């Protein structure tokens, strides 16, 4: 039921507009991370991995590959099961894990592996009031990905990510905020 509501909000302009009006009347700004970057968060995160690994490729080339392989749709983005397919298509090994243990993420980064994490983009924005509203009416849905670059062990600890939905894509989120997302 929650997924159906989310799909309506993503694809039905009139329903989404009504939702935004309701949110605005409650003074809750609407934040759709995936929509703000044309649903390219997966492609751009995989591009960052490929470029870090020395592969010369453009965003447009990756979009064309993903469209041809049916790994990406402009209106919907990239389904979870296809995250990493672009990286694999360039001969790099991808391991998919579905976990919520932050220690696993720490271990992967310490071993020099690249990590793309599925998150609730709104949780990262730090607007807890909006997120409580969204979680109640839409559900807790990880609809955005970030390329995790580093763990900052200072006090308080943080997670440095490349987040294409932000004006300044390289940013450090507080560790507790990242875990919740």
Where in this protein do the model-derived segments appear?
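Conserved active-site-adjacent core of cysteine acyl-enzyme catalytic domains
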Residues: 2-4, 61-181
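Active-site-adjacent structural segments surrounding the nucleophilic cysteine of cysteine proteases
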Residues: 1-77
